Amino acid sequence: MHKFYIYIILVFLALMPRVSASGQELRLPVVPDTLCAPHERAAYVVEHFWDNMCFADTALSHNREWMEQNFVNFLSVMPHAPAEAVDSAFANLLRHAGTNEGAIAVVYELAEQYLNEWQSPMYNQDFFISFLSAAVAEPSLGALYGDRSRYLLEVAQKNRPGNIATDFAFVQADGSEHTLHQWLKRPTLLVLYSADCDHCRKVIEQLKQHAALAAAVEQGTVNVLAVCIDDDMALWRSQLATMPKQWTVGFDGGKIMDNESYELSDLPAIYLLDADCRVRIKELHDLSALNDEKLRKML
């Protein structure tokens, strides 16, 4: 059944019209008949997706609407292709587009929008890392995009799922000092927040009302560690009474921000860690992932 859906997607992409304002089309590559397996055909499509694109034609390559539609189609095949094909596909795209400054600006903007913004339906950190790795390796992009790619790649690779979460120190209200690795004994929802952040307060309130999480905490199967990453201890202390007594609430004095040890582009930053301090979910945005069944499977 899975192979059937891959086949349908490839057929759909092959048949759908792709007409620009100038009436020209971006033709899909013709997959060789010798490639029969769906993943092989998907790999061929993504690797050769842009072969028929002339990036020197600025009526097309600078046309954001036209490029966006084709870029979305390009991304839609990637989940069905092997990882090495995805890497190759991004490298090919950037090699072609990198010769045109306006074109690479459009491509880069689309990659950030669709792959790195969590609100995007195509949000995918693995694909974004693949894109950034290809951008770092592509000499034609120049210093501007090369430097930005290196920075974003470093950020994206921090605390990836499967890796041990970066250690940090924090203090509790009673003055006791801990480190994450020393303190953590069981699966933990780590919440990094700012005391001066309205959105943080809203999300923390949602977590306080989350029935499955509250039950797991009550049963002792999950801990919640909420750490204020500001340097204003007085403000942090003034809000302690609003935090659930079953949670561990800490203060780090701004060191996580200073050290840039966690990605903090969107606060609160929420991570689900297992009992070995490995990241199971990075930057949890959808609280439905904390329902009973998913918690049991992940932890």
Task: For each feature predicted by the language model, list its residue ranges.
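Oxidative protein folding and maturation machinery
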Residues: A21-A173
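Structural microenvironment flanking redox-active thiols in thiol-disulfide oxidoreductases
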Residues: I204-A241, G254-N259
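Short active-site neighborhood of thiol/selenol oxidoreductases, capturing the structured segment around
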Residues: H178-Q209, N223-L225
